[in-house]
């Protein structure tokens, strides 16, 4: 799931818009005494670094099933996964305000991911460990993935927006992208009925949600859900380098993907069924997670790094046969 927030005005959750309070109000519900409007430390959503005694903490939005997410992440932490869990405060944490949940996490000091082979390997290893700790059923009552209802009209609209944004940036979009996306629409019911193995997962496993200490530390587990395992793997393949200043402005190379998988497979044995459906899954996750990203935000096409990443993703979508499991 992807969230873009224009703070103090609106939250954009894919194509839905809801009103939200200002930053001062958010901090005050946790008894942080602030008078001036805080500045987010993250450009795409409200993330506020504040002091709690001698400790630096972060206040951010979490999802509707906040308690489920916290139970899940506490389990991961107990298993030895480096993941943030709620700070113990004098008030409830997380808290709800006007139907929006917010949580206070510790601020984690560390280095940023830079695309080195050892960083890629350790990231893959971490995701494999996370998946290995999932139960066979949705024990933590996490949100269940159910996005199998895209239609051709949505693809047509999405492609119109993508082509328009690209033209303004002086870029031509390969028509093969639309062909692939329309084909993905036809595959949705096949995937829905495939009964692929599901896992509990943070489901937003990408570089900008990791801090290296030097091992990876997951600082944003708030999109946690119950999802087909290889859907989560495909999302990491596609968007691991999204919205990250230090990361390469492209998808993984084939060699890098194999390094990521080598770490992942230390804990996970993928099934033959997953390997059979992998090509369709890559296309479906692009349809669900990447198409709207390219179509929704014209300004990203004017940023050199995002523009290069988008073009890399398009080339990937047209021919990703060598990215195997």
Predicted region positions:
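Conserved NTP-binding catalytic cores of kinases and kinase-like/nucleotidyltransferase enzymes
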Residues: 2-90, 213, 230, 324-325
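Loop-centered beta-sheet repeat module
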Residues: 164-195, 202-203
